[in-house]
Amino acid sequence: GIFGKILGAGKKVLCGLSGLC
């Protein structure tokens, strides 16, 4: 749902900024 999309996008942003992924 909508919340899943928001959480998914947030995880991608955090991964990109932190370089953990």
Swiss-Prot record:
Expressed by the skin glands. Its main location: secreted. Disulfide bonds join C15-C21. One of its GO terms (biological process) is hemolysis in another organism. Keywords: Amphibian defense peptide, Antibiotic, Antimicrobial, Cytolysis, Disulfide bond, Fungicide, Hemolysis, Secreted. It is found in: Secreted. One of its GO terms (cellular component) is extracellular region. It comes from the Eukaryota. The keyword Secreted applies. Pfam families: Antimicrobial22. Has antibacterial activity against E.coli ATCC 25992 (MIC=16 uM), E.coli CIB 84492 (MIC=16 uM), S.aureus ATCC 25923 (MIC=16 uM) and S.aureus CIB 85462 (MIC=8 uM). Has antifungal activity against C.albicans (MIC=63 uM). Has hemolytic activity against rabbit erythrocytes. Belongs to the frog skin active peptide (FSAP) family. Brevinin subfamily. This is Nigrocin-2JDa. It comes from Odorrana jingdongensis (Jingdong frog).
